Amino acid sequence: MNIFFVSLGCDKNLVDSEVMLGLLDAKGYQIVDDETQADVMVINTCCFIHDAKEESIQTILDMARYKEEGRLKALVVTGCLAQRYKQEIIDEIPEVDVVLGTTSYDKIVEAVEEALEGKSEVELADINALPLPETKRLVTTGGHYAYLKIAEGCDKHCTYCIIPKVRGNYRSVPMERLIKEAQELTDQGVKELILVAQETTVYGQDIYGEKSLHKLLKELCQIKGIRWIRLLYCYPEEIDDNLIQVMKEEPKICHYLDLPIQHASDAILKKMGRRTSKQQLIDTITKLRKEIPDIALRTTLITGFPGETQEQHEEVMEFVDEMEFERLGVFTYSPEEDTPAATMPDQIDEEVKEDRQADIMELQQEIVFDQAEDMIGKEVLVMIEGKVADENAYVGRTYRDAPNVDGLIFVNTDEELMTGDFAKVKVTGAAEYDLIGELI
């Protein structure tokens, strides 16, 4: 029986998809890359912002066409959109057989079997459950790097965010389970572990009574075969001395942190429900750069939040200019139903949001270009991602670059390299957000 799987949304959702793929593969289902060859389709959806919701809905409708035409035996929808709009999906898209919530993905085999039997089901476990199936994940990221989801859910309840409603409260995965999963990934050839959660920095607080990310990192560093460990989704107010110290001590931990700050105006941060201030952000970033001089900092910002004035936008611009983040992404504010921010007064016009987004990205581009110029002549360690077609060159990443969201380095060489290899490269040039180098 052939299954075509679509995974939408974030890297945390991708981990759920890989767990489901592992369960289906272990049960004997054949995973196919061609949707026209599928007997069953599974769509793992996202609904974090409006565009993600639209993409999920359109994907379901596109795949439902195969069911309507009789070319597909079963269609299963899971993930955040399924959790949030479970009954609407079943009622309005009759081609969908089974809807699985965000904490029911461990029931994917049963869901597929029910769908093949012609049943129409909505399967929702307790939103605060923490499914931990024993079956190994089917890694889809190429085999040389993988995401390790260390927790589920979120307790922050930012005013613009729907995540607690679709993912539940914060639940840390027990450390021994994560060590086991990391070892299994390494046994499959993974060399870079990327730790993810809605928030990684409070890992362990709920089950161990204290923040334990630094302890988890120490344990992961003991696993042979792991070369890099990277941290994403680190809330700046939760960065502490224990985390900084372990980053300084353990050579496997990339000197890279993803710090989603969202804004730099105290008034907007308060309206967002963020638990920090502009000065606290400055203090944290300053301390990180002092303690770990070669650290690369990534952040994300939201522009056009309700009530954001031109002066507050300019305050963000000044902050970005002063902090000189190595990596930065900007989202325009997306009002999500059932969130406090969606009903706040003074909603901003889309054109204004987009203009402000462009302002920030233009400034950031100048910062990144200057930083890239400073890299010329330096030697860097590169993880090879693949070969450039029809050229004596490869593409890879430095410790400063997370996959899919950051830049790349193009490596010129006549030597043969393999995906996942580590190579020493001398930077010889820069091209927008990417670097160019030669194998040493």
Predicted regions, residues:
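Active-site proximal loops enriched in glycine and acidic residues that flank catalytic Cys/His/Asp
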Residues: A197, Y233, I261-H263, T299-T303, ...
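Short acidic/polar active-site loop segments enriched in Thr and Asp
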Residues: K191, R227, E326, F331, ...
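Proteins enriched for Cys/Gly/acidic motifs involved in redox and nucleic-acid/cofactor modification
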Residues: M1-Y203, N242, I253, L257, ...
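Conserved SAM/AdoMet-binding glycine-rich loop
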Residues: L75-V76, R84, I89, D187-E311, ...
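Short, hinge-like loop/turn segments at secondary-structure boundaries
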Residues: I93-P94, A115-G118, K211-L213, M247-K248, ...
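Short glycine-enriched, charge-decorated loop/helix-capping segments at active-site entrances
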Residues: C47-F48, R167-G168, I207-E210, K270-T276, ...
